[in-house]
Amino acid sequence: MNPSTAQATAVVDELVRGGVREVVLCPGSRNAPLAFALQAADLEGRLRLHMRIDERTAGFLALGLAVAGKRPVPIVMTSGTAVANLGPAVLEANYARVPLVVLSANRPYEMLGTGANQTIEQLGLFGSQVRATISLGLAEDDAGQNSQWRSAVCRVLAAARGTRSGNAGPVHFDIPLREPLVPDVHAQGPVPQGRPGGAAWTTTQHATLDVAMDLDITPDTIVISGHGSALRPELAGLPTVAEPTAPLHGIPVHPMALPQLKPRQAVITGRPTLHRSVSKVLADPAVAVYALTTGPRWPDVSGNVLATGTRAVVTGAPDRAWINRCRTLSEHTDKAVRAQLAAHPKATGLHVAAAVMDALTDGDQLLLGASNPVRDAALVSYPAPKVRVLSNRGVAGIDGTVSAAVGAALAYEEGRTVALLGDLTFLHDASGLLIGSGEPRPRDLTIVVANDDGGGIFELLEQGDPQYAGVFERVFGTPHGMDLAALCAAYRVEHHLVGLGELSTLLSTPDAPGDRGIRVLEVTTERSGLRELHAAVRAQL
């Protein structure tokens, strides 16, 4: 067995021993030893391999697999620009604390700076965006290297999981490979062996970060449950503004009701990413702000946080009048939103979000696109307790969302997956629908596209003010006029153009036995009245 083949075989074997079950692979020559080893492991049923031709979308596929599967997922590619295409997925994984492993093949280091083709200084390419950058030395005809290879894999997985730091995230694992890059079918030689019984070479225990924080909940307290939050039993019963991806610790509070409440104290769990009303409360110097996190970082955009911890030691009790006020105002806001939706003459993204949220049932998985869909979902309803909600909120970009939805659906076997996206988000990553024949496909993924022919979110921001109407449509509205049915046909994906009523019916109708695969349900919406619709809701409060 030649050195590169031996090294790749040991690395893949140790990844499996370390708990890896899904791997995404992009074709290339320099990563051929890894490709052969991964294909063999896939045929043996030790892992599931996903082939993709575009490294950028492949990175987000791996991200979706990792988020939904709650395991590290390697994405394997050749050298050069192939590695650089992982940049957006690495950024998202960093800020969302997702265990993504970028396993890049590299040229031998003596080729750097020589003008060799497809050769760049890729070690360290991701800088501070990864938890660790780990490289292997060039493989030699030396059986003693087996322990070094396997030990390095265990370090990679430990860093990705955050087992010693409490801070999961992406890792760059760079492996220089020297020719021959293909196995010698006539002289295989001994396979590098791991620990007996399939054990990992190095076992690492999960570190527990336990920092108690004293919290008196007698003052009027609001809990802000942000992305990545853990459920906090000690905060049960407290009024909570929860993002769709975050747990609801206590009494639900509609984000649009928050300006009317005037809390004296706010407790952050996770990282708030959505609402301006939340940001204003957290920036108010008259509000005492505390932060509870599960890792070493804590959010504090305004610099107002008084204390941090990983758990609260609660004293006191909330005033019953405060609890009742929060509940009453929130219920009033919920009704105002639904009333204005019913009165609005045309379908908007809010209407589509309401139809989707109302159709979800226990066991469903929902993936929300960035920009308006995740905000719309937060305004129309809080997900049912047994609906799993995902969204790329690390950096909150629209890129890679179709691929992330495909990955999430592939990793989730317990029920169906529904993705709610805007048209620009869908178009930005339409190549995520490209799945090769014979490749694993989602069993049941419905992608709902609210198509308002452009960037609806800008209608609600400062740029959407009528005084900028002469500039708005071209540079912010960005109408595209694309035929989504034709686009889906090119990818051989089922597509239906539906109204709100038909959307509700299709989402609420039980599936027939068997695999549905992927389907796209497109709803034509309008964005020109969004600003007025939101203003009408606020006027009812």
From Swiss-Prot:
GO terms for biological process: menaquinone biosynthetic process. It comes from the Bacteria. Gene3D superfamilies: 3.40.50.970. Pathway: Quinol/quinone metabolism; 1,4-dihydroxy-2-naphthoate biosynthesis; 1,4-dihydroxy-2-naphthoate from chorismate: step 2/7; Quinol/quinone metabolism; menaquinone biosynthesis. It catalyses: isochorismate + 2-oxoglutarate + H(+) = 5-enolpyruvoyl-6-hydroxy-2-succinyl-cyclohex-3-ene-1-carboxylate + CO2. One of its GO terms (molecular function) is manganese ion binding. Binds 1 thiamine pyrophosphate per subunit. InterPro entries: MenaQ_synth_MenD, THDP-binding, Thiamin_PyroP_enz_TPP-bd_dom, TPP_enzyme_TPP-bd. The keyword Magnesium applies. Its EC number is 2.2.1.9. Keywords: Magnesium, Manganese, Menaquinone biosynthesis, Metal-binding, Thiamine pyrophosphate, Transferase. Its cofactor is Mg(2+); Mn(2+); thiamine diphosphate. Catalyzes the thiamine diphosphate-dependent decarboxylation of 2-oxoglutarate and the subsequent addition of the resulting succinic semialdehyde-thiamine pyrophosphate anion to isochorismate to yield 2-succinyl-5-enolpyruvyl-6-hydroxy-3-cyclohexene-1-carboxylate (SEPHCHC). HAMAP family: MenD. Homodimer. Belongs to the TPP enzyme family. MenD subfamily. This is 2-succinyl-5-enolpyruvyl-6-hydroxy-3-cyclohexene-1-carboxylate synthase. It comes from Rhodococcus opacus (strain B4).
